[in-house]
C-alpha cells in the first residue's frame, strides 16, 4: 500500500481556526464536508475563491482539499479558510512538486495579499480598571 501524497496546514484569524488537508486527487475542494461553492455568507464567497483564482484552476485539477473550520464568526472563518487553502497549496508544491513552482505561488499570494500566507497577529486588548473596556473610561463628575 503506497501512501497518498498529502500535507496538512492551518489558517487562523482571531479565534477561528481552519485546518486544510491537501492530497493528490481530482480537484475536489470541500469546506466542513460541503462544496466550496456553498460557503456562507454569499458576499464573502469570492474571498474564499481568491487563492484559486490567483494561481488558476489548472493547479487544482490534480489535488483535493478538505478544510475543517471551527471557532470565530463568519468573516473570521472565511479568512481562516482562504489562508489554510493558500498555505496548503504552497506546502504541497514544496513537498511534492518543485521549488520553483512553490516560489511562484508564494510570490503571487504575497503580492496580492500578505494575509494569505501570514496570520494576522492582532488580538483584543485586555480590559483595565476604571472603565468598561480597554481604553474607555467611566464618565467623570465634578459635583
Curated annotation (Swiss-Prot):
What Pfam families does the entry give?
A: Ribosomal_S9 (PF00380)
Summarize the protein's role: Component of the ribosome, a large ribonucleoprotein complex responsible for the synthesis of proteins in the cell. The small ribosomal subunit (SSU) binds messenger RNAs (mRNAs) and translates the encoded message by selecting cognate aminoacyl-transfer RNA (tRNA) molecules. The large subunit (LSU) contains the ribosomal catalytic site termed the peptidyl transferase center (PTC), which catalyzes the formation of peptide bonds, thereby polymerizing the amino acids delivered by tRNAs into a polypeptide chain.
Its keywords, alphabetically, are: Acetylation, Cytoplasm, Isopeptide bond, Phosphoprotein, Ribonucleoprotein, Ribosomal protein, Ubl conjugation
List the GO biological process terms. Answer: maturation of SSU-rRNA from tricistronic rRNA transcript (SSU-rRNA, 5.8S rRNA, LSU-rRNA); translational initiation
List every stretch annotated Disordered.
123-143
SUPFAM superfamilies according to UniProt: Ribosomal protein S5 domain 2-like (SSF54211)
- Organism expressing this protein natively: Saccharomyces cerevisiae (strain ATCC 204508 / S288c) (Baker's yeast)
What assembly does the database describe for this protein?
Answer: Component of the small ribosomal subunit (SSU). Mature yeast ribosomes consist of a small (40S) and a large (60S) subunit. The 40S small subunit contains 1 molecule of ribosomal RNA (18S rRNA) and 33 different proteins (encoded by 57 genes). The large 60S subunit contains 3 rRNA molecules (25S, 5.8S and 5S rRNA) and 46 different proteins (encoded by 81 genes).
By what name is this protein known?
Small ribosomal subunit protein uS9A
Give the sites modified to Phosphothreonine. 70
